[in-house]
Amino acid sequence: KFGGYVRSYRDEKTGRDMFVQEDYRSVIAVPYDIPVLGYGNNTVNSLRIWDAEPVNTFNLNSFDKGDYQKAIEEENLAKNIVEVLYPNDNHYAGKELRLKQQYFFVSASVQRAVDRYKSMNNVGSEMCIRDSNGDVKNIYKKVTFQLNDTHPTVAVAELMRILMDENGLEWDEAWDITTKTVAYTNHTIMAEALEKWPIELFSRLLPRIYQIVEEINRRFVEEIKAKYPGNQEKVRKMAIIYDGQVKMANLAIVAGYSVNGVAKLHTEILKKQELRDFYEMMPEKFNNKTNGITQRRFLKHANPLLSDWITDKIGDGWVTDLSQLEKLMLYVDDPKAQQDFMQIKYKNKVRLAKYIKENNGIDVDPNSIFDVQVKRLHEYKRQLLNILHVMYLYNQIKRNPDYDMVPRTFIFGAKAAAGYKIAKQTIKLINNVANVINNDASIKGKIKVVFIENYRVSNGEIIFAAADVSEQISTASKEASGTGNMKFMLNGAITLGTMDGANVEIVNEVGAENAQIFGLSSDEVIRFENEGGYDPMEIFNNDQEIRDVLMELINGKYSPEDTEMFRDIYNSLLNNDGGRRADTYFILKDFRSYAEAQRKIDERYRDTNGWAKTVMTNTAKAGKFSSDRTIEEYATEIWKLTKTPVEM
């Protein structure tokens, strides 16, 4: 139900205040189930997805009156909700559609879960609830809503609405049940990604839901004031509704019985920095669940050559117990095993080179170092640092045609949000640089640059298997975890990165000698930020080579048709803009350290045996990063489930 207003009245029989949403527009949620098969365990789960259909497809009355738009209004409402997931929200209409989408999917899913729970109270039913008897008051014993980031957080208020308005529970009882049923996973340290909605939009579109959120906020603010008398700063930071905004992360934390980060460093930063006030007030909620990946897709399926080799060496137990990869450590010094491992890598590089030729029309040398950065494009992930270094390296070769280096193929893959202008400009820069470098015969193929379009799981599988170097170069303290780093590690690539996100745990597993770490630490970044940043103009003025690279952004070298094309990127690195600091993500501050790390990669690659040992060690030490381990931690520590044998 969208829009309308809420009418309240007193029920004479029960003496309760009742709330009814009226004059609303609604859509019908139509379920579809996708079976998800377990690996060799006779288990099939269902992934429930939803389509939206109008209550009335055509309003003949409106049509007869000549109001043709009104006649198909309900049909368009339903169609728009499911047409494009997460549209551009740089404008009001986009924000409204996003909120509609979130509530549509959440409401359909929560309603279905509650109805299913209430109906499943018979032995032999699809979800036997003998100890609960389908009484909605006991739903928390069998159901958890794991809020995966802030997008589904409206589920808190929707569950409250269902418990109170549809099942007759009083507020206190409904809140007690909700706070035993909801758990929250935080996936970002970036403040702007912690979703907020304007009160005007939220209350107009979801009037009953807003009433409930408003009451949750009122009661929680009273708790804050009781615990921290006179501390308005605590209220400002922790209130769910404040300064005209509904803060969804705050709602998730207040309602959730568990709040987890997705890497150890991420969780510590949440506790000490971003969510410090909440951690101080409710420390028992906070815990860590480091992300993982499934080896069955990203090794067994994606890299059959390596998969078969591993099974030949240690058996196939690793397919369901990735910790068994540790047995490969017996082979990391074996010359024959090293040769076999690197031959598999070469064949996978040939496969990727073929894909690049077919899709990009670029010839790349499988004997070159495949240096890969594929991930969502965001300034904090610093694809810009990578391409600026490529420009720097190109300048070195142009100045000295005999520049000694192992040929390098820089491979990018990324998508940017529709309204993220500087991210789109960065993609354009990468492609323009690629066009210049790849068509310069004078550098004799020492560098090639490839931007793989439409980066996705299917071409990712080809990329992960072929990478020599895994670029994980986010500004320290900004990446929650990352999982690409794990996929590359599993397939035998060295991590070139900062001590950020799950990189920290990767280094702990493989040892610092089997990674290439550079740049500011998270503590150093946070200290700079607390002190107002640093002055990038000092680097610009004192480092000629960096200055040359930056000037190429605005002198037309890579955009002869429009010298202003990359002006925004240039300005973002050197100039303060309103409340935004120059070089917000410390690209220039880390540039020299990054360039030195890249030089060491070149040096290490020349040591054939040493390189083989390093990348084999990365595969052997990847056991911790299985999603099997991650999910088991959620199941035992958050959902409080116990393992049940499956009949085979």
Predicted regions and their residues:
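A conserved ligand/cofactor-binding region detector
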Residues: 1-126, 130-648
